Every structure is written in C-alpha cells, then in structure tokens.
Amino acid sequence: MNVYSNVLDMVGQTPMLEVTHIDTGPCRLFLKLELMNPGGSIKDRIGISMIEEAEKRGDISPGDTIVEATAGNTGLGLALVAAQKGYGLVIVLPDKMSQEKIFNLRAMGAEVILTRSDVGRGHPEYYQDLGKRVAEERGAYFINQFGNPDNPLAHEMGTAPEIVEQMGGDLD
C-alpha cells in the first residue's frame, strides 16, 4: 500500500478495468476508472494542469484567488488543488446544482456564488459571464476551463500516455 503526504500525488494512475460480462462484439473494451482520483472524477487532472501551468507562466502564486464558472466536477477538482497549494477559490455555479456539491465545495474551502440557471450566454447572470466579471472585479485569476489550453493538456501529457502504458501500447 502506498502512503502519500500530499493528496495531489494521488491523482492519476487510475486503474483500468476490462469489461467482460457484457457483449462487446469483436472488441475488447476497457474502462479507465477516473472515479478513483481523490476528488472522485477525471476533473482532478485538469485542476492540477490548469493551476500548475498558470503558476509556471507566473499568472498566479499562492495566496492569489482563482475564479471559475462551472456546472460540473471541475469546481471540485480546482478546490482540491487550490486548498493544497494555498489559493483562494471562488466558484460560480448555476442555481440548479445539488446541495451536496455546494456543500462539498464549501467544505474544501471554496466560496460559492450561485446564479440563475435559466439564462444564456450574454445575460449578466449567466454563470460563465458572471465568473469572468467576478474575477475582473476582484482582481482574481479567471481560470476559464472552457477556453484554457491547459485543460486538454492534462490529458495529452497525463491521461493518454497513462492509458498507452497501462495497455502495453496495444491500442487500436
């Protein structure tokens, strides 16, 4: 059993499972169990990537505040990383999010701002537009998962090579 001193070291190297009890036709089907990441999803990987790449560029340093607009697990991945690295985190969420997700974000140290879920892009209360505005008003870093090239970089540099290694290079 591995013993870790930092929860971020536990992100990645998630197991692969071959599906054998349902008909997969002529194919062998494998599942990558990203739920085994400490935050419970693949979004832990992008949280690390987006924050660490911003650090490398000098865009942020511990003590700064990061803002993100999210309707999914990205907020939890960012909260995990921000808490470990000493960043403030503000998450802007549509009001339809579950109370459990909101509770978890707050428990991980994030400030949660709820906004309307019944409006679209261009409306002042649309979650992505509001997230950008909150970052500007607070002088914080808007991480912008939807337009951030460090989001897919997590998979180009981490997830994909990990799959190739776990499969012994035998992919089609």
Please state what every model-predicted region is.
Residues M1-D172:
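PLP-dependent amino-acid enzyme catalytic core
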